[in-house]
Amino acid sequence: MESAIGEHLQCPRTLTRRVPDTYTPPFPMWVGRADDTLHQVVMGYLGVQFRGEDQRPAALRAMRDIVAGFDLPDGPAHHDLTHHIDNQGYENLIVVGYWKDVSSQHRWSTSPPVSSWWESEDRLSDGLGFFREIVAPRAEQFETLYAFQDDLPGVGAVMDGVSGEINEHGYWGSMRERFPISQTDWMQASGELRVVAGDPAVGGRVVVRGHDNIALIRSGQDWADAEADERSLYLDEILPTLQSGMDFLRDNGPAVGCYSNRFVRNIDIDGNFLDLSYNIGHWASLDQLERWSESHPTHLRIFTTFFRVAEGLSKLRLYHEVSVFDAADQLYEYINCHPGTGMLRDAVITAEH
């Protein structure tokens, strides 16, 4: 049994765990492992927003342009494509890229082909919305959890490998305790979302500044290779409850501290749906994410179902990754997106702006 925290990230713990040292988890789970050369990763969520079938071809072309840019020097080591319909009826094509270090992502994003595309006046006049939500957690600021050991998705795809069975799972509070930084830091949030350029009500280009310790969760489901019984388990038993919880967070986020929630379906380059999905949730703080997870009926039902079936899972792949960030390691930028998009909804326009 291993700790979820890599040996090179372990230090004397000043904050106590929720379980005793003798705790044994009820079933096996694993985490992504990276060596001490990985200091900080970058997660880039690059979106194209549209409404109506007449805009779909142009939106798909724009998505393909973004993906083509990943082939340039310093492009991400891993990416995937997703689709989301928000509660205003807009469709969003989201290209998600992962970089193993900040410098390569910076070189990529500032290269002339990429920066000129994003900064072009065409982005303001082509009838689509665009956004980029880019965050860069340090190695001690993110955790992963997988019910499988191969072909890790998300940030796991840019790590070196996978752990043995880990100890920190199967109890409330284990998510926090998989963060290396949790050994000595409560990861308390401070500040608020602020609009620092533009006006969401007007449109055009809008930039939102984040605050310390915003939390981002990506929680995924892969039923592509599942047999009939596991497909039924997911589609008939897990998905309805999951969808209910995700819709609640999408529509009632401010009441519980959730800035943005998108339950997305993976797609291919032509926009066809794949049998994979995940949730993208931005939270005002990790403790607010914890409170919702531990108390809301929909999540409690999901958690109970997972506990019941986890040990017998074969080809239904379930996982999550959670991260927090310093304010300086976040960028939220929107072009002609509706004011309820992403971090725009809860961002405050200050007097000095």
UniProtKB/Swiss-Prot annotation:
Quick one: signal sequence residues? Answer: none
According to the UniProt entry, what is the EC number of this protein? 4.8.1.2
Task: Give the reaction(s) catalysed.
Answer: an aliphatic aldoxime = a nitrile + H2O
Activity regulation per the record? Active when the heme iron is in the ferrous state. Activated by FMN, Fe(2+), Sn(2+), Na(2)SO(3), Na(2)S and vitamin K3.
The positions flagged as active site in the entry are H320
What Pfam families does the database record attribute to this sequence?
A: Dehydratase_hem (PF13816)
Keyword field contains Lipid metabolism: no
Which residues of this UniProt protein bind heme b?
Answer: H299
Temperature-related activity notes?
Optimum temperature is 30 degrees Celsius.
Cofactor needs: heme b
* Presence of keyword Iron: yes
Q: Which residues bind an aliphatic aldoxime?
A: S219, H320
**UniProtKB keywords:** Heme, Iron, Lyase, Metal-binding
Q: What pH behaviour does activity show?
A: Optimum pH is 8.0.
* Molecular function GO terms recorded: lyase activity; metal ion binding
Fill in the subunit field for this protein: Homodimer.
Q: Which family does it belong to?
A: Belongs to the heme-containing dehydratase family.
Its annotated function is as follows: Catalyzes the dehydration of aldoximes to their corresponding nitrile. Is active toward various arylalkyl- and alkyl-aldoximes, and to a lesser extent toward aryl-aldoximes.
Q: What is this protein called?
A: Aliphatic aldoxime dehydratase
Give the classification, highest ranks: Bacteria, Bacillati, Actinomycetota, Actinomycetes, Mycobacteriales
